[in-house]
């Protein structure tokens, strides 16, 4: 019998990729999301149009489900602190309660590399101390701790900590970068862009989650591209690919970071304090644990995935700018 997998946040960018990957592997997929689900996949899943904060409806949606992949997350860019806390913490508690009550065999929590903050040394492995430096990282760490609390009571739990996610349809702050490259504007880096910055493709992350489900392996895993490079090299690869007139311009981080923080505080910028803190810093994972445990390997390099993401943006630019393309939720 095919396993039943429920993906929370399945209407979001990563959630939809996870749904597609599980469907292609023959699983019966259920989606729980407050936002409408993809029309192209609607006939292939059972969709629960439910708010993760509604405990009773969440519990009902999880009846008969074997595996839960929890992708729901409220990002701090929304600037709504009450919504941020209720979705990320209370919502996670609700889905964990439902998993426990319905005796689900496996709970997979999608966390974030933001739990590490700005690490003292690289590469970062699963034993590196978690030191989140902003709200999103703290919320993700709180979610991890909740999940591990339920694990101590007998729930089988896996936690994935992905690096910054890219892939077809990935927008958010990348829309700003892609539009600048399209228009030939200068692209700023801090202190020469020598910092090593790692991404992960949504397909590679979804593949890791699928393998974890298939192999029934539990624990914490860092996920990132195996082939990555400096920020300057990544951006150069994008600019050359786009045949853009953009130039990479180095800026003094000690001057620009306070300005970015001020703009974020005044709500004049879509960027959060975390972006200012980390943009000029190195952060990359040691992925030896996930490679060995799940026999996983990344398909995409940093440069390949940012080029692919840019190509998608250009092909869909008109719809995106009209507001009919994929939103920040994506």
Language-model regions, residue ranges each:
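N-terminal Rossmann NAD(P)H-binding glycine-rich loop of SDR-like oxidoreductase domains
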Residues: 5-25
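NAD(P)H-binding glycine-rich loop region in Rossmannoid oxidoreductase-like domains
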Residues: 52-89, 98, 115-118
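Glycine-rich NAD(P)-binding loop of the Rossmann-fold in SDR/ketoreductase-type enzymes
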Residues: 53, 83-94, 134, 138-139, ...
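Conserved Rossmann-fold NAD(P)-dependent oxidoreductase catalytic core, especially the SDR/UDP-sugar
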Residues: 94-135, 150
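Active-site Tyr-X1-5-Lys
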Residues: 133-158
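Flexible, glycine-rich beta-alpha linker
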Residues: 158-175
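Alpha-helical substrate-binding/gating segment
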Residues: 178-187, 197-232, 236-240
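Mid/C-terminal beta-alpha module of Rossmann-like enzyme folds, strongest
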Residues: 215-271, 287, 307-310, 317-328
């Amino acid at each position: 019998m095919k396993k039943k997998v429920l993906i929370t946040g399945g209407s979001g960018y990563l959630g939809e990729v996870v749904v597609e990957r599980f469907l292609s592997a023959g699983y019966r997929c259920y989606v729980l999301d407050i936002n409408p689900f993809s029309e192209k996949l609607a006939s292939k899943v059972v969709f629960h149009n439910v708010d993760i904060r509604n405990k009773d409806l969440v519990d009902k949606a999880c009846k008969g489900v074997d595996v839960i992949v929890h992708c729901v997350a409220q990002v701090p860019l929304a600037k709504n602190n009450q919504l941020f806390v209720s979705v990320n913490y209370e919502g996670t508690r609700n889905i964990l309660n439902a998993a426990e009550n319905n005796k689900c065999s496996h709970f997979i929590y999608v966390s974030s590399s933001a739990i590490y903050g700005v690490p003292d040394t690289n590469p970062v492995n699963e034993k590196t101390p978690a030191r989140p430096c902003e709200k999103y990282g703290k919320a993700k760490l709180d979610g991890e701790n909740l999940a591990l609390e339920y694990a101590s009571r007998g729930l089988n739990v896996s936690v994935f900590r992905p690096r910054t996610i890219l892939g077809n349809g990935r927008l958010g702050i990348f829309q700003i970068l892609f539009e600048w490259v399209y228009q030939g504007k200068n692209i700023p880096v801090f202190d020469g862009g020598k910092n090593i910055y790692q991404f992960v493709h949504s397909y590679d992350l979804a593949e890791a989650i699928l393998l974890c489900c298939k192999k029934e392996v539990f624990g914490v895993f860092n996920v990132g591209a195996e082939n990555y490079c400096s920020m300057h090299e990544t951006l150069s690869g994008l600019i050359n690919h786009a045949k853009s007139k953009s130039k990479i311009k180095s800026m003094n981080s000690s001057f620009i970071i306070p300005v970015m923080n001020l703009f974020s505080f005044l709500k004049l910028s879509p960027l959060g304090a975390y972006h200012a803190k980390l943009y000029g810093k190195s952060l990359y994972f040691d992925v030896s644990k996930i490679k060995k445990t799940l026999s996983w390997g990344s398909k995409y390099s940093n440069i390949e995935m940012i080029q692919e993401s840019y190509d998608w943006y250009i092909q869909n630019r008109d719809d995106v700018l009209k507001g009919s393309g994929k939103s920040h939720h994506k």
